[in-house]
Amino acid sequence: MERIVVTLGERSYPITIASGLFNEPASFLPLKSGEQVMLVTNETLAPLYLDKVRGVLEQAGVNVDSVILPDGEQYKSLAVLDTVFTALLQKPHGRDTTLVALGGGVVGDLTGFAAASYQRGVRFIQVPTTLLSQVDSSVGGKTAVNHPLGKNMIGAFYQPASVVVDLDCLKTLPPRELASGLAEVIKYGIILDGAFFNWLEENLDALLRLDGPAMAYCIRRCCELKAEVVAADERETGLRALLNLGHTFGHAIEAEMGYGNWLHGEAVAAGMVMAARTSERLGQFSSAETQRIITLLTRAGLPVNGPREMSAQAYLPHMLRDKKVLAGEIRLILPLAIGKSEVRSGVSHELVLNAIADCQSA
């Protein structure tokens, strides 16, 4: 069992990583006997894990209600969020309740925002079931729902009480979702840890076949890196922005193509190549390093070009609505070397458009 602590003073919390955690009531600390829980999951995961998690919580004496949401990025919306509030109010659940997010990034982000908002804030626990949510979205307290005009535009910073990563969940993950998660894994190597990127080049095949020790190390290293960044910059005023490599381009793809048509990791993968091409055009990143990124993403089964039907010009309106925009200027996360990156403002729209075009004609 691996345990990592996100250090945020009184709001510090553990990330527990192991197989078989759904069999152990102690995995879901700080829940105690007699407490009330609303378990939030989706229609795909409910048949797989709902009864198991409900059972282990009830074994610990916890009173469990549940709400099952539709599955898909297109349902990460205010309308679906309202169904969680309705379920909480109908029981009713008070300010002493705990929300448990059993699912991937959509369930986790939406449940976290529900917890931040319900009665001005209740406790919640993240139980991520996808690789993407285990290495990224469940850690750090970013919660949100989407708006038709932009991804994650309505949300809050709100930290969980704990994160429970059961590696066994990956056994039921579709290959496309596994690849989507690997995009965020590769991101950590590009922005923060060149040695980890080297390790990924050597061990990607083991990850694709869900090798236990390799996957445990991979998830642990990603969580360590994210925990360090969040502890240093919880509300994304500086360092934490680096975690958005590829996301300014990627969110544009998701919004333009319709949420759910491109998985988040797929859009981020293409966006990371666009960021690398932008950095190349600025003369601060080599084509050889871009090729290393492209090769690793391709091996993972991820796209390295944007949608053919989406023009370069179509990216700009979405990018100008990005949450990182300051004083009307797009701020981009750009690699400087494998393992090193920067936040860059003032890049001309023409250069950005040319970099996007590079990734459409490649």
Swiss-Prot record:
Catalytic activity, reaction form: 7-phospho-2-dehydro-3-deoxy-D-arabino-heptonate = 3-dehydroquinate + phosphate
Cofactor(s) listed: Co(2+); Zn(2+); NAD(+)
Compartment annotation: Cytoplasm
Entry's Gene Ontology cellular component terms: cytoplasm
Pathway, per record: Metabolic intermediate biosynthesis; chorismate biosynthesis; chorismate from D-erythrose 4-phosphate and phosphoenolpyruvate: step 2/7
Cofactor note text: Binds 1 divalent metal cation per subunit. Can use either Co(2+) or Zn(2+).
Keywords: Amino-acid biosynthesis, Aromatic amino acid biosynthesis, Cobalt, Cytoplasm, Lyase, Metal-binding, NAD, Nucleotide-binding, Zinc
Molecular functions per Gene Ontology: 3-dehydroquinate synthase activity; metal ion binding; nucleotide binding
Enzyme Commission numbers on file: 4.2.3.4
Pfam families: DHQ_synthase, DHQS_C
Predominant location category: cytoplasm
Chain residues that bind NAD(+): 71-76, 105-109, 129-130, 142, 151, 169-172
Record's keyword annotation contains rRNA processing: no
Binding site residues for Zn(2+): 184, 247, 264
GO biological process per UniProt: amino acid biosynthetic process; aromatic amino acid family biosynthetic process; chorismate biosynthetic process
Function: Catalyzes the conversion of 3-deoxy-D-arabino-heptulosonate 7-phosphate (DAHP) to dehydroquinate (DHQ).
Similarity annotation: Belongs to the sugar phosphate cyclases superfamily. Dehydroquinate synthase family.
Name of the protein in its database record: 3-dehydroquinate synthase
Source organism phylogeny: Bacteria, Pseudomonadati, Pseudomonadota, Gammaproteobacteria, Enterobacterales
Gene it is expressed from: aroB
